[in-house]
Structure formats: C-alpha cells, structure tokens
Amino acid sequence: MLVAFDFLDMNAKNITLRPGRPADAAKIAAMSRDLIETGLGWSWGPDRVARSIANKDTFTLLACDRDRVVAFAIMYFGDEHAHLNLLAVRPSHQRLGIGRHMVEWLTESAYAAGIATIHLELRAANYSARTFYRSLGFTESAYIPGYYRGREMALRMMRVLRRPGTPLPAWPAPKLPKS
C-alpha cells in the first residue's frame, strides 16, 4: 500500500504513506529516541518497535519523502478503543500537514474498524502538541503525574468516534444497476 496526498506545502509533494515493515524498526526507534523520548531514556528501542510492527493489533504508518522516513505513527487497535502510542515528524518536515494527514488516516481507519474512542498521552508541558490534537478533535481527559519515568506529568487526550457499546453505523447497501 502506498498512498500519496496533497499536502499543505509544495515542499512536501513527494511524501507517500506506507505501512511500517520490520526493516524500519531501527529508524523508527531512533526517531522516537531523538524526537519524542528526549531526556527520558529510551523505552521504544528497535526490539520494542519491531514487536509492535509484528503485532496484528498494532499498525505502524510511515511518511516517506522519496525513500527517507520523515514521520511515523504507531497505533494499537483494541475491540472498541485505539491508542496512539507514538507520533513523530522530523523537524525538517513539520508544519507541512504530514502529521495531520497521518492522524486523519488512522482515525478514519479506526472508525471503519468500529473503534469507539482513540486515546493518547503526551507530555503535559507540550502545548504545541495539545493544540495540534485539539485541532483534530481530541479533548483533554486526565493528567497523570509521574507518567514519564516518574519524572514528568502526562496529559491523556481522547477522541470519541462513537459511544462505546453502541452498534456500528450501518453501511448503505450498494445500489446495483437494474438489468
């Protein structure tokens, strides 16, 4: 699967989205260490990322500029709830709409899979991430003291796609041509 999008900035015109593969684990782990886990130690190392990629309930989405990985997202899909574990965009490719397209793609996939809510955590002091997720329909649901290695508070956010326990939306039957 390769998906091309029209992004907000002409510099991003060569961006494609594709699923993560086991061979991508080291690149994704390094990006997590450098862009997300700064100052916290490294919990999403290559082995953990590789296990996530191999997990049938987790989807890893990559954004590539030609052959270079410039962004990634890892999302776990449960029965009714999904959890966006990680999202990172290289600084050289931020503010081009890449992260937004990735979260929108994952949200649409979650909705199609019957997911009721998507949850995520971020550093409570990361105000730009709060603003980003709010713009995508996420709301703040809880503060978690010491979430990051006992040192930093997390903010949990969620987006409701449908009420848990309610039936899935009915898909209209396709209209077949009359013969």
Identify the residue ranges that each predicted region occupies:
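Short acidic/polar active-site loop segments enriched in Thr and Asp
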Residues: 80, 116, 139
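Short amphipathic helical patch at the helix-1/turn junction of helix-turn-helix
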Residues: 89, 123-124
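Conserved short alpha-helix immediately C-terminal to the canonical SAM/SAH-binding motif I
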Residues: 102, 126-129
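Conserved catalytic-core motifs of GNAT/GCN5-like acyltransferases
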Residues: 119-122, 134, 139-156
